């Protein structure tokens, strides 16, 4: 099923240009960027203009956040991890991948950087904020174990209803997935996926419907999701187990919940910036990180 886009757009290219132009000024050079009849645009004038843009401070903040995270935790996130995530999106969207990037404001390189930023942020969260025993016990109350299902994603409700009728008539789920599912990432393996309740890429309606199923059962009505309609069959719904045996999964569940909490993640980022002694030298851009600095003083 299609992954929901939750990545921050890092407009690093413009921010990079801003810093490069700033560096040129510090070297007391003022190269010509462009000419026109009667004049020219110099690096210093372009730099001054860029600083007036309302988005420049945001772009600079994003760039500094990425660099601070990468300096602090870069060794914890491998290139393979980023590439695997990138390839997963690429496979999922197929020939529509470039359109997906464009719609979300990414180039291929900036998309990889955003993926890396997400991974780095998760590492920072785990390093700087620990899960307590009481938080684990609270998570245990609503915890559900990892399940494995088959699913068929259709673009319209009528097709999903026909799939359910075909299943009732005894047709094979895996064969129907291959012929009727529009999810190119799973249709050829019978529509099989495994996930936990804290999975961030699946629709809540999908997860809610799946966890209500017993082994061998399938949804009797189409499940409405962001990308269409789902028919879901439960393959393996294990017992909940014990609190002690589930601590690792519970910890992952708490961190997944925290990673979706913008206030928590902002505090984590503010601490990273503080630990990395990030300072903006240009007085016109000096308040670009003020929202994070205020959080750091209350941590």
Swiss-Prot record:
Chief subcellular location: membrane
Gene Ontology process terms (BP): protein folding
First-level EC class: isomerase
GO cellular component, one term: plasma membrane
Cited function: This protein is essential for production of active forms of the serine proteinase located in or secreted from the cell envelope.
Protein's name according to its UniProt entry: Foldase protein PrsA
Keywords of this entry: Cell membrane, Isomerase, Lipoprotein, Membrane, Palmitate, Plasmid, Rotamase, Signal
Lipidation (S-diacylglycerol cysteine): 24
Species of provenance: Lactococcus lactis subsp. cremoris
Protein family membership: Belongs to the PrsA family.
HAMAP family to which the protein is assigned, alphabetical: Foldase_PrsA
Ranges of residues in domain PpiC: 144-236
Subcellular location: Cell membrane
PANTHER family in alphabetical order: FOLDASE PROTEIN PRSA, PEPTIDYLPROLYL ISOMERASE
Membrane topology, from the record: Lipid-anchor
């Amino acid at each position: 099923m299609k992954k929901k886009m939750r990545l921050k757009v890092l407009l690093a290219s413009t921010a990079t240009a801003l810093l490069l132009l700033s560096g040129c000024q510090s070297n007391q050079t003022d190269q010509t960027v462009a000419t026109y009849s009667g004049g020219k645009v110099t690096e210093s004038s372009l730099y001054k203009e860029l600083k007036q843009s309302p988005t420049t401070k945001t772009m600079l903040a994003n760039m500094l956040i990425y660099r601070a995270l990468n300096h602090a935790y870069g060794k914890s996130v491998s290139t393979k991890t980023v590439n695997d995530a990138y390839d997963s999106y690429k496979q999922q969207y197929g020939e529509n991948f470039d359109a997906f990037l464009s719609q979300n404001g990414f180039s291929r390189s900036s998309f990889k950087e955003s993926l890396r930023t997400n991974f780095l942020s998760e590492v920072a969260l785990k390093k700087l904020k620990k899960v307590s025993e009481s938080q684990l016990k609270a998570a245990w109350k609503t915890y559900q174990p990892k399940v494995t299902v088959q699913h068929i994603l259709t673009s319209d409700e009528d097709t999903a209803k026909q799939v359910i009728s075909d299943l009732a008539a005894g047709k094979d789920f895996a064969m129907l997935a291959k012929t009727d599912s529009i999810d190119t990432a799973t249709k050829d393996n019978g529509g099989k996926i495994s996930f936990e309740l804290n999975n961030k890429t699946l629709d809540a309606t999908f997860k809610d419907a799946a966890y209500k199923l017993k082994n061998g059962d399938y949804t009797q009505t189409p499940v409405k999701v962001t990308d269409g309609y789902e028919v879901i069959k439960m393959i393996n719904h294990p017992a909940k187990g014990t609190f002690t045996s589930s601590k690792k999964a519970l910890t992952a569940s708490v961190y997944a919940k925290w990673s979706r909490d913008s206030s928590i993640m902002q505090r984590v980022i503010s601490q990273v910036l503080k630990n990395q002694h990030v300072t903006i030298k240009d007085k016109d851009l000096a308040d670009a990180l003020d929202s994070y600095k205020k959080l750091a003083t209350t941590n």
